[in-house]
Amino acid sequence: MTRLLGYVDPLDPSFVAAVITITFNPLYWNVVARWEHKTRKLSRAFGSPYLACYSLSVTILLLNFLRSHCFTQAMLSQPRMESLDTPAAYSLGLALLGLGVVLVLSSFFALGFAGTFLGDYFGILKEARVTVFPFNILDNPMYWGSTANYLGWAIMHASPTGLLLTVLVALTYIVALLYEEPFTAEIYRQKASGSHKRS
């Protein structure tokens, strides 16, 4: 880690922008989704929980594009690491990127659009929590797929800055999950409890 830090200028504007977007994005969608779950104000404003969810998803996607752009610019503005600048490392990065894409896309198809973009906070619930691939091989595959994408991208660019930012991506997801997992579990517990009472 100390060796990586020697390549990184933490005051570089591109690096600062990447750090801000990486940490802001999960905070944004968690705060907005919980506020919606508590107040239903977005659903009322848009006249439908589906429209509200889709509108939030647009902002999340735009923020994710911005995060990826800032991540890439931060890598390009700082030195490459010679020991990573090899065909073998590039191939490893490409494989990680491919794995990440598979996890992200398969998660999206398993969850559906609303499920991917916090639909459960809008009252758009599935019959039960999703357990098909890739959820049957690991928890939170969307987040780990995204992390693999960034890790692969960083290795392909032989970028110590990218590796450090990937660690930050993983840490922000871990912190987000500390809030999201119990909350989602409680939403589905309440749904199951309500179903039992009606039956």
Swiss-Prot record:
Record's keyword terms, sorted: Endoplasmic reticulum, Lipid biosynthesis, Lipid metabolism, Membrane, Methyltransferase, Mitochondrion, Phospholipid biosynthesis, Phospholipid metabolism, S-adenosyl-L-methionine, Transferase, Transmembrane, Transmembrane helix
Membrane topology (Lumenal): 1-12, 34-45, 115-157
Chain segments annotated as transmembrane: 46-66, 94-114, 158-178
Post-translational modification: Isoform 2 is N-glycosylated with high-mannose oligosaccharides.
Intramembrane stretches (start-end): 13-33
GO biological process terms, semicolon-separated: blastocyst hatching; methylation; phosphatidylcholine biosynthetic process; positive regulation of cold-induced thermogenesis; sphingomyelin biosynthetic process
Tissues of expression: Primarily expressed in liver (at protein level).
Keyword Hydrolase found: no
Result when mutating residue 181 to D: Impairs binding to S-adenosyl-L-methionine
Record field: catalytic activity: 1,2-di-(9Z-octadecenoyl)-sn-glycero-3-phosphoethanolamine + S-adenosyl-L-methionine = 1,2-di-(9Z-octadecenoyl)-sn-glycero-3-phospho-N-methylethanolamine + S-adenosyl-L-homocysteine + H(+); 1,2-di-(9Z-octadecenoyl)-sn-glycero-3-phospho-N-methylethanolamine + S-adenosyl-L-methionine = 1,2-di-(9Z-octadecenoyl)-sn-glycero-3-phospho-N,N-dimethylethanolamine + S-adenosyl-L-homocysteine + H(+); 1,2-di-(9Z-octadecenoyl)-sn-glycero-3-phospho-N,N-dimethylethanolamine + S-adenosyl-L-methionine = 1,2-di-(9Z-octadecenoyl)-sn-glycero-3-phosphocholine + S-adenosyl-L-homocysteine + H(+); 1,2-di-(9Z,12Z-octadecadienoyl)-sn-glycero-3-phosphoethanolamine + S-adenosyl-L-methionine = 1,2-di-(9Z,12Z-octadecadienoyl)-sn-glycero-3-phospho-N-methylethanolamine + S-adenosyl-L-homocysteine + H(+)
Keyword Transmembrane belongs to the record: yes
GO cellular component: cytosol; endoplasmic reticulum; endoplasmic reticulum membrane; intracellular membrane-bounded organelle; mitochondrial membrane; mitochondrion
Leader sequence residues: none
Pathway as given in its UniProt record: Phospholipid metabolism; phosphatidylcholine biosynthesis
Gene3D superfamilies named in the record: 1.20.120.1630
GO MF, any single term: phosphatidyl-N-methylethanolamine N-methyltransferase activity
Top-rank taxon, per record: Eukaryota
Job description of the protein: Catalyzes the three sequential steps of the methylation pathway for the biosynthesis of phosphatidylcholine, a critical and essential component for membrane structure.
Family according to the record: Belongs to the class VI-like SAM-binding methyltransferase superfamily. PEMT/PEM2 methyltransferase family.
Protein name: Phosphatidylethanolamine N-methyltransferase
Gene that this polypeptide is encoded by: PEMT
